[in-house]
Design a protein with these regions (language model features):
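Amphipathic alpha-helical segments
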Residues: 1-19
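Long, charged, glycine-rich C-terminal linkers/tails
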Residues: 20-24
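Intrinsically disordered, low-complexity regulatory regions enriched in serine/threonine/proline
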Residues: 26-215
Length: 215
């Protein structure tokens, strides 16, 4: 996995929730982001992105630079009430794995990317929200079959979703159409084009925010 691709996965982890106080050094790139800045649903999506970012890197053999310059996220702090008991337990284990510099161990029973996606979906984003980071990571890790499975699952979820004040019927139909287009691209072996597009989107966004410094 190249530095640029890994940085993109990392940028996906930080793109939702930007702030001060935490520094991650990932394969030559310096990124700053704060975990606890806004509403619980944003925190949830951020954590899911962080899981996929770190664990995809671990699965693909990219070592994380957890040097003395890196502040381990204080997952069990003043705001843990937003997670509930299950969330607190998972995040405590995750923090422990980070401190021990062994992220892979955290998901030892889910060594595959699909296992990681399943797990993050279950504990972080159980509703019908568009959990983009999961299939983004699959595409970026060059696992199109995994991305197809996840995108297909999302399409089915959107079809069964009931519109409400936050999600309209038109929005759901748009998501279905977009996801089906991505599936078609991947099935036709066009994953490289989609991967390049995701890289450009994420990397460009991080540059605009001043959160990426080239090594």
């Amino acid at each position: 996995m190249t530095k640029r691709v890994f940085a993109t996965i990392a940028s996906e982890a930080l793109s939702m929730n930007i702030g001060k106080g935490y520094v991650y050094r990932l394969d030559g790139h310096v990124m700053r982001g704060c975990l606890f800045d806004s509403a619980p649903n944003v925190k949830g999506k951020f954590f899911c992105k962080l899981f996929v970012c770190l664990l995809t890197g671990a699965v693909d053999g990219v070592k994380l630079d957890l040097s003395e310059n890196v502040k381990i996220p204080k997952i069990l702090g003043k705001r843990t009430d937003i997670w509930g008991a299950e969330g607190q337990s998972q995040h405590k284990k995750f923090a422990s794995a980070l401190r021990k510099r062994n992220v892979r161990q955290f998901f030892a029973r889910n060594a595959s990317l699909q296992g990681i996606i399943d797990h993050t979906e279950q504990i972080v984003w159980p509703q019908f929200g568009d959990n983009q980071n999961a299939w983004h990571a699959a595409v970026l890790a060059d696992d199109p079959s995994c991305a197809i499975v996840y995108l297909s699952r999302m399409v089915e979820r959107f079809r069964n979703a009931v519109p409400n004040e936050f999600v309209t019927e038109a929005s759901l139909q748009s998501k279905i159409q977009t996801h089906e287009q991505f599936i078609e691209m991947l099935e036709q072996g066009d994953s490289s084009l989609l991967r390049d597009e995701l890289i450009n989107q994420s990397h460009g966004r991080m540059k605009l925010l001043g959160l990426v410094k080239e090594s």
